[in-house]
UniProtKB/Swiss-Prot annotation:
Membrane topology: Peripheral membrane protein
Entry function: Produces ATP from ADP in the presence of a proton gradient across the membrane.
Keywords per UniProt: ATP synthesis, Cell inner membrane, Cell membrane, CF(1), Hydrogen ion transport, Ion transport, Membrane, Transport
Gene3D superfamilies the record matches: ATP synthase delta/epsilon subunit, C-terminal domain, F0F1 ATP synthase delta/epsilon subunit, N-terminal
Family of the protein in this entry: Belongs to the ATPase epsilon chain family.
Native species: Pectobacterium carotovorum subsp. carotovorum (strain PC1)
Underlying gene: atpC
Protein name, UniProt field: ATP synthase epsilon chain
Cellular component GO terms, alphabetical: plasma membrane; proton-transporting ATP synthase complex
Length: 139
């Protein structure tokens, strides 16, 4: 049996996942993080993107995160996010429309603030589309 640890993924609205996992992959403020059993304690910010969960028996699940906090303790990992959406619950048409609008805003931005905001929105839309793609492949 593979080594595991307990993972909780919680949004402001609900608990998205709670159970034993082999590993997770998430984008932290300093880059990609792979959290395996026995990982050193850690507290870091999470960038908008996804958390890839490899469950106890090897099944994979993808959840979109709007950003948040990752806490790693010896036997428990907690992901806290303002918004967390399961891959199968994401709306591809809305994500594509958000991507198109963000690209338009980038082309028509007037100043650093406009560009930074549009760039952040584009990153979120691309992350949602990536979660949708990976969720389809995993099914």
């Amino acid at each position: 049996m593979a080594m595991t640890y307990h993972l909780d993924v919680v949004s402001a609205e609900q608990q998205m996942f709670s159970g034993l996992v082999q590993k997770i992959q998430v984008t932290g403020s300093e880059g990609e993080l792979g959290i395996y059993p026995g990982h050193a304690p850690l507290l870091t910010a999470i960038k908008p993107g996804m958390v890839r969960i490899v469950k106890q028996h090897g099944e994979e699940e993808y959840i979109y995160l709007s950003g948040g906090i990752l806490e790693v303790q010896p036997n428990t990992v907690t992901v806290l996010s303002d918004t967390a959406i399961r891959g199968q619950d994401l709306d591809e048409a809305r994500a594509l429309e958000a991507k198109r609008k963000a690209e338009d805003h980038i082309r028509n931005s007037h100043g650093d603030v406009d560009y930074a905001q549009a760039s952040a929105e584009l990153s979120k839309a691309i992350a949602k589309l990536r979660v949708i793609e990976l969720t389809r492949k995993a099914m």
